[in-house]
Amino acid sequence: MSILFYMIFLAYLRGIQGNSMDQRRLPEDSLNSLIIKLIQADILKNKLSKQMVDLQENYQSTLPKAEAPREPERGEPAKSEFQPVTAVGPEWLRHHRRYNSPRVLLSDSTPLEPPPLYLVEDYVGNPSVANRTARRKRYAEHKSHRGEYSVCDSESLWVTDKSSAIDIRGHQVTVLGEIKTGNSPVKQYFYETRCKEARPVKNGCRGIDDKHWNSQCKTSQTYFRALTSYNNKLVGWRWIRIDTSCVCALSRKIGRT
């Protein structure tokens, strides 16, 4: 199509040149050479375009075909949220330490101290363990006396009897209490932090302007991995919610700006 256009255009130019008396005629060989060059340029352009298309098709054919993501079946947890467990033993516990977290502990004895890097000021210990008074006295020595106060008062302790929880998908799951690993069974302990009371002072959180704000201390939760079962089957690691902090919730009083 483009070659035909060139031919018509050149014929048009030649007709104009023939009607003009002031311009000299182009030699016949010059006009022919110009036509040949235009035709060669058009052929080369079409050839390059075809080569580019072939290269793109060859490249697409060499790429591996992407598999469509498989939708989880009904009742089947997602891979990123659930790791099944076939058998629990000392070797298994040693190979799955990467799932351990500071707030979830697998141990054959009740922990007596808070996890590393956690504050000891709000640790209340376990009332069922002996020598609790001595430990609390020892922890009290670490408290600061710089006149600093928290907006909310919290307390932390090891929960030894957690039986159920809500996982990251909103399902009610059963927390494995005792895990048999031979001669010494282990238990799961959860280091939880919660509010002592909703209103540490008369009007809510400490240090909040009660003329403009309503305030209340609330326990906040975070997801941690734990060994659980769903519908008495599918035992494995899941993300569950546990109490981890005490925060102050604010709402502006009506009519205040």
From Swiss-Prot:
Identify the stretch annotated as signal peptide in this record. 1-18
Q: Which UniProt keywords apply?
A: Cleavage on pair of basic residues, Disulfide bond, Glycoprotein, Growth factor, Secreted, Signal
- Region (Disordered) residue spans: 61-81
Gene Ontology biological process terms, A to Z: cell surface receptor protein tyrosine kinase signaling pathway; modulation of chemical synaptic transmission; negative regulation of neuron apoptotic process; nerve development; nerve growth factor signaling pathway; neuron projection morphogenesis
Where is carbohydrate linked to this protein?
A: N131
Q: Where in the cell is it found?
A: Secreted
Q: Which family does it belong to?
A: Belongs to the NGF-beta family.
Job description of the protein: Seems to promote the survival of visceral and proprioceptive sensory neurons.
What's the protein called, per UniProt? Neurotrophin-3
